[in-house]
Amino acid sequence: MDLHFENIRREYDKRSLSASDLTPTPFDLVTRWLQDAVEAKTYEPTAVIVGTATPDGHPSTRTVLLKEFLNNEFIFYSNYESRKGQQMAANPHVCLTFLWHELERQIHVEGDVRILEPELSDAYFATRPYKSRVGARISPQSRPIPGRSFIVQEFMKESLKYAGRTVPRPDTWGGFAVKPVRIEFWQGRESRLHDRFLYELRPDASWSVHRLAP
């Protein structure tokens, strides 16, 4: 069955982005836009699409939740042995996309990823709800399983094992930190004449910024 969507259109007319809104580095603007998304009560304001690729260039994406923007790095948590974890271990070049429909905004990030320090992963893991900590321990993320009953049974067994006790962070789970080298800010505008500004990291650690054609 063919599907046609050419008649689905929306005009973007809520906001603008001009050179006067920019900051010397992109990080203040990243902070401002993330805060705007939270304050506007957008749906999942910290959701971010993470793009990874194998060493020979086969890409994949998935959506995770940003948990910290710390020391100018974007931090999220996941299983090191998942598909994304394995791809990031083999090829540290990644991209991120934040999309806030309600604000008609996007941020696109390119950079290199590293595994977060264990003590920081431990500290975050301790803040997670009990069931989330148990789930992180028993899920062989991205691998085939016999059925849902398998993962439910494993969850029940691990829950009983740690009932009333501290659930330790598994060695296969922790944080990833993305250090950006390119950050683009996209603001939807009327007639598809969108505002786009690209920051790029220079060798001397300063940032260049250019307006891009929509």
UniProtKB/Swiss-Prot annotation:
Cofactor(s) the record lists = FMN
Q: Which domain of life is it from?
A: Bacteria
Kindly list the positions annotated as binding substrate.
9-12, 67, 124, 128, 132, 192-194
Single GO MF annotation: pyridoxamine phosphate oxidase activity
Q: List the disulfide bonds.
A: none
Keyword Flavoprotein among record annotations: yes
Q: Any idea what this protein is called?
A: Pyridoxine/pyridoxamine 5'-phosphate oxidase
Classification of source organism: Bacteria, Pseudomonadati, Bacteroidota, Bacteroidia, Bacteroidales
- Give the gene name: pdxH
